[in-house]
Amino acid sequence: MSGIIATYLIHDDSHNLEKKAEQIAIGLTIGSWTHLPHLLQEQLKQHKGNVIHIEALDEQEHINSYLGKKVSRGLIKIHYPSLNFSPDLPAILTTTFGKLSLDGEIKLIDLTFSDELKKQFPGPKFGIEGIRNLLQVQDRPLLMSIFKGMIGRNIGYLKTQLRDQAIGGVDIVKDDEILFENSLTPLIKRIESGKEVLQSVYETYGHKTLYAVNLTGRTYDLKENAKRAVVAGADILLFNVFSYGLDVLQALVEDDEIPIPIMAHPAVSGAYSSSKLYGFSSPLLLGKLLRYAGADFSLFPSPYGNVALEKEEALLITAALTEEDHYFKKSFSVPSAGIHPGFVPFILRDFGKDVVINAGGGIHGHPNGAQGGGKAFRAAIEATLQGKPLHEVDEINLHSALQIWGNPSHEVKL
């Protein structure tokens, strides 16, 4: 079936899911149906949205209480013909959820693209396998850390932070998403200084680290800024996708003059996906759509930290990023926020080896600094892969980390 199928979670105070579904299908396509002359119906039939599935769900009293009324809940699926929209995300999202998103009681759970439609999207340029090949790391999760406290600091401070994190065994260091173009640490200077530091660490310690630099600026300047970054030697671009739009991400990915991986940050996405009643589902927004548009990495709140996402949601995001699809490479999951070494066994148990463990305070807050923090994480990763409990590991940096943040994983089994 060509076109796209949208799955919605609806809350209906008229208690007629069939009628509500049909209203949506008609309202987002031809506008009306039953009052049209037969000849016009025949002409418009190929453009009409069609309800293909309705599933009633159990009533939930806490939702009724929140809404201040009794509602029927249900999942509905509607097919939208490809004749109705151009094969791009702005058209697809407007068709399936444009004015409907203003309802306030409908959540877009999923979009199922036809094979023909999938061909219009690039998917990740590198994907999990390509990123692993860049780092020459095949047998373990990747470790990522974050520059902290860079606003108002100079290049010397950045170089010191970067060096310590790289020596600690971190695979990727990323800019803070709130670090924009500025006179103290301008984009090109960050890239050039970063390359100098990371090359020195590689020559001395034999460990390769990549630097994800924040791509910022006005939308019409982004491509030029990205190309300047590439010429300067950037390894990875960090991109605040939802501040700009998914289509902007796709445009960057499809540009052959920007041949480096792109890491999608979830900033602003909470405004679209946090509610259980309306907006986008997290697996759709932070999983499927980011992968289709071309993100090599997707950051999202972990189920364990201080900005936690429900575990089921986080795992569904990962499934959308990594499920087999011969049209698209797999994207790296990056569960983030509040991660310390004691959580490593949880992460590997829940997400497997094809994951990026992302830590900020869990590395910089270590008593031996970022070097000690990185080494603690690497020791935790190695021990977990060997099936060894963290409290039995004879590594001083990991021991210190567990004393500070605890070891909630002492009973976790892979």
From Swiss-Prot:
Residues annotated as coiled-coil are: none
Q: Which domain of life is it from?
A: Bacteria
Q: What does UniProt list as catalytic? A: K99
Q: Where on this chain does Mg(2+) bind?
A: K174, D176, E177
Q: In which pathway does it act?
A: Amino-acid biosynthesis; L-methionine biosynthesis via salvage pathway; L-methionine from S-methyl-5-thio-alpha-D-ribose 1-phosphate: step 3/6
**What does the record list as GO biological process?**
carbon fixation; L-methionine salvage from methylthioadenosine
Q: Which Gene3D superfamilies match?
A: Ribulose bisphosphate carboxylase, large subunit, C-terminal domain, RuBisCO large subunit, N-terminal domain
User: Which cofactor does the UniProt annotation name?
Assistant: Mg(2+)
Q: Which reaction does it catalyse?
A: 5-methylsulfanyl-2,3-dioxopentyl phosphate = 2-hydroxy-5-methylsulfanyl-3-oxopent-1-enyl phosphate
Modified residues annotated as N6-carboxylysine in this record: K174
Keyword terms, alphabetized? Amino-acid biosynthesis, Isomerase, Magnesium, Metal-binding, Methionine biosynthesis
**Quick one: which residues bind substrate?**
K148, K174, D175, D176, E177, H265, G338, G360, G361
Give one Pfam hit by family name.
RuBisCO_large
Entries under InterPro entries matching the protein = Diketo-Methiopentyl-P_enolase (IPR017717), RuBisCO (IPR033966), RuBisCO_lsu_C (IPR000685), RuBisCO_lsu_C_sf (IPR036376), RuBisCO_lsu_fd_N (IPR017443), RuBisCO_lsu_N_sf (IPR036422)
Q: Cofactor binding mode, per the note?
A: Binds 1 Mg(2+) ion per subunit.
Q: Which GO terms describe its molecular function?
A: 2,3-diketo-5-methylthiopentyl-1-phosphate enolase activity; magnesium ion binding; ribulose-bisphosphate carboxylase activity
Tell me its EC number(s), please. Answer: 5.3.2.5
**Keyword set includes Amino-acid biosynthesis:** yes
UniProt keyword Signal, yes or no: no
Q: What else is known?
A: Has no RuBP-carboxylation activity.
| Family stated for the protein in its record | Belongs to the RuBisCO large chain family. Type IV subfamily.
Q: What PANTHER family does the record point to?
A: RIBULOSE BISPHOSPHATE CARBOXYLASE, RIBULOSE BISPHOSPHATE CARBOXYLASE LARGE CHAIN
Q: How does it assemble?
A: Homodimer.
Biological role stated in the UniProt entry: Catalyzes the enolization of 2,3-diketo-5-methylthiopentyl-1-phosphate (DK-MTP-1-P) into 2-hydroxy-3-keto-5-methylthiopentenyl-1-phosphate (HK-MTPenyl-1-P).
The molecule here is called: 2,3-diketo-5-methylthiopentyl-1-phosphate enolase
Species of origin: Bacillus mycoides (strain KBAB4) (Bacillus weihenstephanensis)
The organism's lineage?
Bacteria, Bacillati, Bacillota, Bacilli, Bacillales
